[in-house]
Swiss-Prot record:
GO terms for molecular function: acyl-[acyl-carrier-protein]-UDP-N-acetylglucosamine O-acyltransferase activity; structural constituent of carboxysome shell. It is an enzyme of class 2 (transferase). Pfam families: Acetyltransf_11, Hexapep. One of its GO terms (cellular component) is carboxysome. The lineage of its organism: Bacteria, Bacillati, Cyanobacteriota, Cyanophyceae, Oscillatoriophycideae. The keyword Nucleotide-binding does not apply. It is found in: Cytoplasm. This is Acyl-[acyl-carrier-protein]--UDP-N-acetylglucosamine O-acyltransferase. Its main location: cytoplasm. Homotrimer. Belongs to the transferase hexapeptide repeat family. LpxA subfamily. Involved in the biosynthesis of lipid A, a phosphorylated glycolipid that anchors the lipopolysaccharide to the outer membrane of the cell.
Amino acid sequence: MLINIRPGDAPLSTPIHPTAIIHPNAELHPSVQVAPYAVIGEQVKIGASTIIGPNVVIEGPTEIGVGNRIFAGAVIGTEPQDLKYRGAASQVKIGDHNQIREYVTINRATGENEVTQIGNNNLLMAYAHVAHNCVIEDEVIIANSVALAGHIYIESKARISGVLGVHQFVHIGRLAMVGGMARIERDVPPFTTVEGNPSRVRTLNLIGLKRAGVNEAEISEMKKAFRLIYRSNLTLKQALEQLESWSNNPYVQHLRDFLHQSTTVTGRRGPIPGKE
C-alpha cells in the first residue's frame, strides 16, 4: 500500500532525511528511504524498498516500482527536451529492481498520456540520458555517458557500451551488444555485435547467447542464418525469404521478424548493415 509521507511524520523505520523536500501529494511506501536534499514532487509514486540517494530530483507524473536504487544527482520525470512539447500530461514509469546511477536523466514523454518506460532489473550507469518516449525492456545494461534520443526502443538483455549516442526512433534488439563510442543511427539487430563509426554488424553475440542459456544446436543454426544474411550475395529480402522456409528456431525467427519490420514498418530506420 502507498501512503502519503512527509519528512516530519515519517515512521522511525523509514529514514527520510529532514533536508529532503517531499510534496504533500507524493505517495511513498513506508519502507522507502530518502537521502539528504532529495526533492520529490507532486504526482510521484514510489514503491516498497526503493532507496533515493542525495540530491535526487523526481518530478511527476512518475511511477517507480519496488526495490529500486536511485543514486546521487539523478533527475527523473522532468519535461522532455523536445520543442514540440506543449505541457501535455505525460509520464515516466519505472519497474522494479533497477539501478539508476549518478546523474542519470530520464525525461517524460512528449504527447498527451504518453509514457517513457523502463522495465525491471536494468542498470543505467552514470550520466546516461533517456529521452522522451523511450522504452527500455528488462535486464538491459546502459553504460556511462550513453545518450538515448527520443522514441528509442531497447529489447531485453541488450548491452550498450559507453560514450555513444543513439539516434531517435532506433530499435535495439534483444541480446545485442553495442561497442563503445559507436555511432548508432539505424536499428541494431538482435543477438548481434555492432561497433564502429559508421557502425557495422560484426558478428553474433556468442558470449551473450551462451550466458542466456541458448543451446549449441540453436547457436549453430543462428550462425548459418547470420552467414546467409551478412556473408552471402543475397539481398536482405532474399535472405529473409529463405529463412522463412528453413528455420523454426525461435531466435532465428526473432532475428528475421526484427529485420523484416525494420525494413517495412513506417517510421523504422532500417537495420545497420554488415561489415564491408
